[in-house]
Amino acid sequence: MEGTVFTPCLEGMKHVKSDQGEMLTKPFLELCKTILPVIDKFGAAMTLVKSDIGGNITRLEKNYLSDPDKFKYLYTFVQVEIESKIAKGSSSCTNGLLWLTRAMDFLVELFRNLVAHQDWSMPQACADSYQKTLKKWHGWLASSTFSMALKLAPDRKKFMDVISGSGNIQADMERFCAEFGPFLHDNHKFLASVGMDDMKAS
């Protein structure tokens, strides 16, 4: 593997915003897709996360492809749905963007933990990240299912060996967190500005 498993993500981040600083739909979704192979390396522990992320990318992408000019900018989905009064629906693009962003919050926090806590086991790093990000938005059933799955997290050393490739994995993880985190912050900021950042799982 040329570079690390993060190399495509780091490259994709350069194209996510327009020259005016607006979040572009297609590059953002493509960036999220580059993270799916990273999730694959976790095996069964991340099956739920991968399925959730993949489903939300597909939902947003389908709507984007219905009118690429109209939905060139990521937040247009939300603005259109708010006007149509469907933004709070469980199958809305607004809901999809919110949960996609939250799942990515979890992954960023997980990789922050792996960088900052060299002595933590993988299940410990996963559990801490879940507590800090997704847990408060999940109901009891989702929380129990998620916590059970995270116990299947792979051995940390084996995982690091698999994702390292020929690059500097510590440096790439740090860059991933530092550069991807602000995009997620922007999403939350926008969603909060229209009252859509605090929806819980049903």
UniProtKB/Swiss-Prot annotation:
Protein name: Glycolipid transfer protein 1
A GO molecular function held by the record: lipid transfer activity
Transmembrane portions of the chain: none
Pfam hit, one: GLTP
InterPro entries (alphabetical): GLTP_sf, Glycolipid_transfer_prot_dom
Name of the encoding gene: GLTP1
Gene3D superfamilies: Glycolipid transfer protein
Gene Ontology CC terms: cytoplasm; plasma membrane
Entry function: May be involved in glycolipids transfer.
Keyword annotations from UniProtKB, A to Z: Lipid transport, Transport
UniProt source species: Arabidopsis thaliana (Mouse-ear cress)
Residues the record lists as binding a ganglioside GM3 (d18:1(4E)): D52, N56, W99, H138
Similarity field: Belongs to the GLTP family.
